[in-house]
Structure formats: C-alpha cells, structure tokens
Amino acid sequence: MATADELDRREREILRALVQDYIHTGEPVASQPLLSRHELEWSPATVRSVMADLEALGFLEKPHASSGRIPTERGYRLYVDTMLKVRPPSPADRDRIERLAQAAPDVSSLIEGTADLLHSLSHHAGVVTTPRPQADPVRQLEFVRLRENRVLVVFVSAAGIVTNKLVQLEFTMEPAELERAAAYLNEKLHARAEAAEPELAALRAAILGDMRADQSALHDLLQKALVLAEQSFAAAGVEKVVMEGESSFLDAPEFSDVQKARALLRGFAEKDRILRVLDRVLTAQEVQIFIGAESEFATVPDVSVVAAPYGRGDRVLGTLAVVGPTRMNYARVIPLVDLTARQISRALAALSEGG
C-alpha cells in the first residue's frame, strides 16, 4: 500500500477535492463534477485515471454500480492528517461556547450543557463524560434519613459534582446519629484530601484505627459509620456519559438502512463501549480523531469520533466529543471540540475557586 509521502501532487490534489465534495454532498463523486467544482489543471481522462489509481491504492472506493467514488477510511485519514485546513469557530459559535462556560451555575449543569451545545453546533451527537472518580474524589457527604433504615446519601466531589444515592441499612440510625456520622466522615475525608488511596480505603483505615484506640463512647457510632461508608461508596464513584443528539445520525444517507441505524443506536446504548473509546483520550494533550474502525465505537462502519480531554489545572477529569458520520465536516468540528474543551476547563477552575 502506498503511503501519503508516495502520492504525487496530482494524486493529493484530486483526493483532497474529492473528499471535500463528498463531505459536502454525501453523493459519490465522478470526474466531471469534480472538474466543474474545482480549478483542476488536468483533463477529465487524467482525473478518471488518477481516481482509478487512488482506488487501487485503497484511498477511494466505488460503491455499487455508481460512476463516482467515495473516500475510504484510509482516504479520510490521509485527508485529516495532511490536507485538512481547519478554520477557527465563527464569532457566533465562540460566543455560545463562552456564554455556556460563564453562565453554568454548577458542574453538573456545565456537563449537561456542554453535550447539548456540541450537538447544537455540530449537528452531530455531543458526548461528555463526567469527571472520573480517580481524578475527582468525594470531598463531602451528607446523609438524609428517609425511613428507619433508608438513607439518601449526597456526595459532593472535588470538582463540585453533586450526586445522590439511596442506601438500605440493616439497622436504624436516628437523624442525630446520621449528622454525627457525616461530620465524622467528612473530617476524615478532608484529612485525606491529598492522599492517593481511594476514599473508602482511607475511611476504613481511619475508622478502624479510631475503634482500636478504644474510644468506647463512639464505638457504636463508628461501627455504624463504617457500614454506612462502605455501602455509600459501593454505590458511588461511577463515571457516567452524558449524550445529546444521537438521533441526528438518522438524517445522514449513510444510515438510511434500518438495520444499520438500529446497530448504531445500540452502540450508543452501550455506555461501557463509549467510555472505552473516550478514555483513550485522557492522556492526550490535544484533540484526537478516530475515523471509522479506529474508534471501535459501534459494530457499524461510517462513524467517527472527534474528542478532547478537559480538566482543572493540570488534572484531567474527563472527555468531551462529537460523534458523527465519517463524512462529518472535520474542518469545522475539530476547532469546535478544541475550543469547547479549553473553555470548559477554565469554567471548572472558576467554579472550583468560587466553591
């Protein structure tokens, strides 16, 4: 197989023009329309010959009996890596991104708003992962008694994410006991704020240490606090995916086939698969583009992911992405994802300082 460096100027120019046309029209591109839309200096016969060569090299393919050709995943990859000229987001797009980052009252609203905004700006699916538990530990707990042995646990993470979990206990805790347990556990959490070990391991060690110290007046409360902590943290610490606009794929001609569309939507429903894809971006310093099979997003072809990490300071918390057809407008989507990740990171820092 030829590499990008082995293509001559004529082959590169024709491939670039064809990919751009296919992204714009969604229709297989023939030589004559290509010549009419671009100022190519070669004859129709030459263009047809070069297109045939590019097909033989694996950069183009000819669907069915069509007279035109479309890019393969290899063709898209070459285009994105070596030919693409990204353009900065428009002032209107930039303003919408900045307004979201400045106006979000809390981290949860920021995450949800980001997924919706990415969908709105790109017209593809917007996807955002909530901060990872490893990077965003629990910093405060609150217990609310609902019934004798049912407790609502309110978690507040270091980034300000608030989540609720219902815990069923095998014993009864009075509201005053729950308040004392929360105060005790929060004191231990704050003391371990910079520790590398998970919250539950730190809490368990601290509680057992206090119990061994024979603080008899607190012994019963500490036993209950230990059980409460174990059950609470067993229900917490799950990275989540927020998505908006999955159905936008159904507007693309590539997904007009019902079986293919169903397979794609099943892929969106498999949150673990999505997390595996997006977690590959956590160690990156910039936008990452996964084209087609590279993404492992779903069991169907023609899906690409443009993703970037976001964080607070030098700590990466999660990932945001646009998921769309391989025929997406990369020149527009890549800078949108990049700017959004940077603005959301700044907003997280501001929310953290404000909290």
UniProtKB/Swiss-Prot annotation:
One of its GO terms (biological process) is negative regulation of DNA-templated transcription. It holds the Pfam family HrcA_DNA-bdg. It comes from the Bacteria. The keyword Iron-sulfur does not apply. Transmembrane segments: none annotated. Keywords: Repressor, Stress response, Transcription, Transcription regulation. InterPro entries: GAF-like_dom_sf (IPR029016), HrcA (IPR002571), HrcA_C (IPR021153), WH-like_DNA-bd_sf (IPR036388), WH_DNA-bd_sf (IPR036390), WHTH_HrcA_DNA-bd (IPR005104), WHTH_transcript_rep_HrcA_IDD (IPR023120). One of its GO terms (molecular function) is DNA binding. The keyword Transmembrane does not apply. Coiled coil: none annotated. Negative regulator of class I heat shock genes (grpE-dnaK-dnaJ and groELS operons). Prevents heat-shock induction of these operons. Belongs to the HrcA family. NCBIfam families: hrcA. This is Heat-inducible transcription repressor HrcA.
